[in-house]
């Protein structure tokens, strides 16, 4: 409802309705299919400019989200992931899961929430695949549970050079580099909600991903734009994410990362 009111041109991924791009006031929110440059191109260009210069706010609720827990959760993820995930609580790690040929089966972010609890996040199309992969490939005897919590949390990406100012204004927290370094994850109070904020980006700008219990999603979304009005925040969609991640050289599972491409071939040796 909030997205439609803002002029969203909606698309879908794995049953999730989500904003591809936002039409400006007065323009019909529909895609114009043409052999020429489409009418939505300047709409996305404006979203990209705002994300680079002020703040873009993205609804990324369609992210696949699952908890990996249990006495052997660390050992299971250490076995499956290319990166070392035995990190301090509140640390997020970008990593992959590979097949026996060294090719990608999953492209994920793993955040340690507790000694034996991890939040694993991947693309919208990968939830069933990733959960199945972890369950099937976990070593025999490991006491590890995998629970899909995708529908329990909305995700808002607050991205851009003014994202720190916006979230500091809303939360009252210290979000400086010293207090909240890159790849740090911790809880923030946002209005009536307690959300998990992870400092990470898929668009190449300063930003945070906010994981919000769904019952508080509408209120937090409204609060973000109320605070964001003071810094020029705009709603932005998946066309903008795709354009900016390509410009930055970030990879995506199912596109650059597939089962016959290795981390070295993908230029992601640093994740191993």
Regions picked out by a protein language model, each given a short descriptive name:
Residues 1-272:
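Glycine/proline-enriched, intrinsically flexible loops and inter-domain linkers
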């Amino acid at each position: 409802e909030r997205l439609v009111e803002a002029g969203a041109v909606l698309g879908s991924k794995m049953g999730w309705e989500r904003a591809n791009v936002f039409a400006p006031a007065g323009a019909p929110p529909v895609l114009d299919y043409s052999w020429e440059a489409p009418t939505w191109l300047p709409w996305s260009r404006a979203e990209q400019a705002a994300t680079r210069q002020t703040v873009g706010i993205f609804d990324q609720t369609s992210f696949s989200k699952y908890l990996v827990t249990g006495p052997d959760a660390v050992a299971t993820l250490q076995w499956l992931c290319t990166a070392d995930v035995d990190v301090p609580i509140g640390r997020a790690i970008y990593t992959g899961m590979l097949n026996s040929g060294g090719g990608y089966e999953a492209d994920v972010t793993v955040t340690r929430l507790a000694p034996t609890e991890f939040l694993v996040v991947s693309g919208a199309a990968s939830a069933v695949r990733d959960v199945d992969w972890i369950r099937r490939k976990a070593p025999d005897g490991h006491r590890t549970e995998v629970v899909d919590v995708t529908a329990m949390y909305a995700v808002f990406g607050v991205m851009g050079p003014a994202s720190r100012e916006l979230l500091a204004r809303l939360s009252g927290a210290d979000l400086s580099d010293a207090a909240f370094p890159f790849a740090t994850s911790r809880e923030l109070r946002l209005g009536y909600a307690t959300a998990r904020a992870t400092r990470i980006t898929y668009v190449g700008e300063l930003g945070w991903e906010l994981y919000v219990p769904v019952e508080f999603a509408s209120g937090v979304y409204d609060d973000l734009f109320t605070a964001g009005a003071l810094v020029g925040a705009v709603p932005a969609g998946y066309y903008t994410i795709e354009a900016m991640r390509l410009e930055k050289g970030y990879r995506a599972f199912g596109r650059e990362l597939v089962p016959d491409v290795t981390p070295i071939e993908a230029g992601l040796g640093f994740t191993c």
